[in-house]
Amino acid sequence: MSDYKSTLNLPETGFPMRGDLAKREPGMLARWTDDDLYGIIRAAKKGKKTFILHDGPPYANGSIHIGHSVNKILKDIIIKSKGLSGYDSPYVPGWDCHGLPIELKVEQEYGKPGEKFTAAEFRAKCREYAATQVDGQRKDFIRLGVLGDWSHPYLTMDFKTEANIIRALGKIIGNGHLHKGAKPVHWCVDCRSALAEAEVEYYDKTSPSIDVAFLAVDQDALKTKFGVSNVNGPISLVIWTTTPWTLPANRAISIAPDFDYALVQIDGQAVILAKDLVESVMQRIGVSDYTILGTVKGAELELLRFTHPFMDFDVPAILGDHVTLDAGTGAVHTAPGHGPDDYVIGQKYGLETANPVGPDGTYLPGTYPTLDGVNVFKANDIVIALLQEKGALLHVEKMQHSYPCCWRHKTPIIFRATPQWFVSMDQKGLRAQSLKEIKGVQWIPDWGQARIESMVANRPDWCISRQRTWGVPMSLFVHKDTEELHPRTLELMEEVAKRVEVDGIQAWWDLDAKEILGDEADQYVKVPDTLDVWFDSGSTHSSVVDVRPEFAGHAADMYLEGSDQHRGWFMSSLMISTAMKGKAPYRQVLTHGFTVDGQGRKMSKSIGNTVSPQDVMNKLGADILRLWVASTDYTGEMAVSDEILKRAADSYRRIRNTARFLLANLNGFDPAKDMVKPEEMVVLDRWAVGCAKAAQEDILKAYEAYDFHEVVQRLMRFCSVEMGSFYLDIIKDRQYTAKADSVARRSCQTALYHIAEALVRWMAPILSFTADEVWGYLPGEREKYVFTGEWYEGLFGLADSEAMNDAFWDELLKVRGEVNKVIEQARADKKVGGSLEAAVTLYAEPELAAKLTALGDELRFVLLTSGATVADYNDAPADAQQSEVLKGLKVALSKAEGEKCPRCWHYTQDVGKVAEHAEICGRCVSNVAGDGEKRKFA
């Protein structure tokens, strides 16, 4: 028997079947670094239109987790897809480097500043610690395949950035947005510092719920208001609170002007309550026998005075819009030093902003004899006992409610009035302008707009001062007596900024005021406060984007972070940019959900359901992690588990196998010499290129819309359905058996080449390592890296006017599917082994029959059978299988006649008819020793 294997064009490529990504990716990264791939991309894109995605800085503390990976991978996909879309899209990664978490880490190791180390030495230790954290996180981010200027990231602790943060504050002061006040702020007694809104988390807490009677000073005036004379016992206004410890700071009782308030007679006394809450209050305090003596509107009670239950003063009834009928009594205990609503109404009525609580959460001396020095959370029982003793306690019970806690310590926090610096939301119209700016931004998903609008509309003034050691100094001088800012504040801040730019923030603490104030130095003091770290990161649009040369003065097009950043970085950036420049710092804001496990549970070390990105990369490779991110709808929670990652790995194999098939069959193809013109190509090959063109249109649209899961789905459909189960199957016969240099084969290779050129680019933003690997095996002259180019523009398709247009082949796909069903059944029944052992007759109605007949003898190649004939639908025998998809089609199968050709494996009647090649069929003889077969359609 002759060996005809050597006459076949068998696929051959050095591109490995197995990805072995965990082993192979580090080598690629080393090459990218050695070549300065990021620099090559920047040079290639120079002068193009820009797209700037500004990196929200992760905090420089701890290893990266799966959420960090999601964030950086999404950014990288966008940057790379924008590059392929013709944009110059630089990526400058950043880190947030100041603040409490770093201080706490350094304290754990070295103690608090002033104990073993001076404050200056402590700051130096903080800077060292942050630098080591940046280095660790940077290695992991690079390992993810994220391309960026990793050698020159921005750090909020860079001297120049620290200086520019001071300048940003100066601009805000110059625009009139800063004010000082003793105002209640979120205060953590463990941190001994004010907290930003974004540093507050809510947990369930059990607190005492109490109803307290405030005795009326002028009993007769109240009787007159309610139009009654016969009242049994004293009259009180009743408040309800879950924070008894705040009662020493009570300075008023708030009621609603339009609510009806009832005077209710109970045993031995009368109480004033909101009429709509009388029944629920009576049930709560256990009173069944009561009488409503009269009602008045809340406005009638304004400025009537009531005796504080245990402090030696009385307080007014005041009118407030914050009073509701949701719970309580309709009268609200008001302590301006312990709550933002209380503070606002207190300002309106000129109330004292009393703050009897020290920074450590204990009452200050002189508050009340039994309370001085007591922790406020331990004081509730003392206050309740006092109320009981004074006869003012109507009811007490325990209740569980959501309570604000410190994000770092997870301990309850308090509202505490302290002298702080604020960015005002309203004194210069910052709130109104911010709300206007929000409308000009594209929010992705669109619900982000309503979310941040609500937050801006309702947020208090922003407390930007902190009493910390490791932070950017506010760099302010205030008068010793008046506490007013120095009249040359902006000029002085610029002088400080220049020094910080040279020596870092320590320059402020080393600064002797005389150096820049001269003779005035004795009249002014340096403000010791540092800036909220959210001010650091929130001002990077100014301190980084506006000054980095690669951004060339362009504002950021996009901010992209987790959905918690509406109240974090998106908010602080919007506030600062609007206060500085009157406009938003971004054009688009994209948010992604949090990662959860396969059961939808939050990631938790205690549950043991965390997924380490480092483990995934070491086991499966970064491309699998990237594919999981891209294939998950990031607009909601993003589920990840070993099983989910395994599915991503399965999808990866399908894409890799498709790429490998293309490369293996491009063996020996030189596009410069072997390319077939579109008009001379086999029709099916043109259809395949057209499929790629249609897929590319969908994929590019999805990239443009940031719908990456749609990119993956479309890519998978192209690889699995249009290519894998149809086109690539059909062309194997022609590719392997036709003459090597025949039009039939070169046409096929031309199609595969166009498809591969497109496919590798579709993959590149997501499967960056694999795309780089594929790129290295593609034939023809090309740039060194896929990332420097643009989307492939060599695709074309069939014209609708052609007889065998896309609709024709779509119908052939369905016919092929129906034939496959019949063949599978015949294989199950042991009638045939493989499809080439079968011959089929297609009984079709005239319109379909005409299409099938048009393919002539090439129909069998489309169906992967040794024989295929077309007959009239009405002539179908009883055992012909009716198609469920195509009503005008029945399929009958028989065993193919003739002998099996050992070269092409088709069964034909002409095997052995040519004496010189007695073992093979006539078609193979032509391909081996003759002019070669001609293919027109398939």
From Swiss-Prot:
Residue ranges the record marks as coiled coil: none
Record-level GO cellular component terms: cytosol
Cofactor: how bound: Binds 1 zinc ion per subunit.
Cofactor entry: Zn(2+)
Assembly and oligomerization: Monomer.
EC number(s) per entry: 6.1.1.5
Residue sites binding Zn(2+) per the record: C901, C904, C921, C924
Originating organism: Escherichia coli O1:K1 / APEC
Chain positions of motif 'HIGH' region: 58-68
Subcellular location: Cytoplasm
GO molecular function, one term: tRNA binding
Motif 'KMSKS' region in this chain: 602-606
Reactions that this protein is recorded to catalyse: tRNA(Ile) + L-isoleucine + ATP = L-isoleucyl-tRNA(Ile) + AMP + diphosphate
Protein name according to UniProt: Isoleucine--tRNA ligase
Residues the record lists as binding ATP: K605
Domain notes: IleRS has two distinct active sites: one for aminoacylation and one for editing. The misactivated valine is translocated from the active site to the editing site, which sterically excludes the correctly activated isoleucine. The single editing site contains two valyl binding pockets, one specific for each substrate (Val-AMP or Val-tRNA(Ile)).
A single BP term in Gene Ontology: isoleucyl-tRNA aminoacylation
Function: Catalyzes the attachment of isoleucine to tRNA(Ile). As IleRS can inadvertently accommodate and process structurally similar amino acids such as valine, to avoid such errors it has two additional distinct tRNA(Ile)-dependent editing activities. One activity is designated as 'pretransfer' editing and involves the hydrolysis of activated Val-AMP. The other activity is designated 'posttransfer' editing and involves deacylation of mischarged Val-tRNA(Ile).
Family of this protein: Belongs to the class-I aminoacyl-tRNA synthetase family. IleS type 1 subfamily.
CDD domains: Anticodon_Ia_Ile_BEm, IleRS_core
SUPFAM superfamilies: Anticodon-binding domain of a subclass of class I aminoacyl-tRNA synthetases, Nucleotidylyl transferase, ValRS/IleRS/LeuRS editing domain
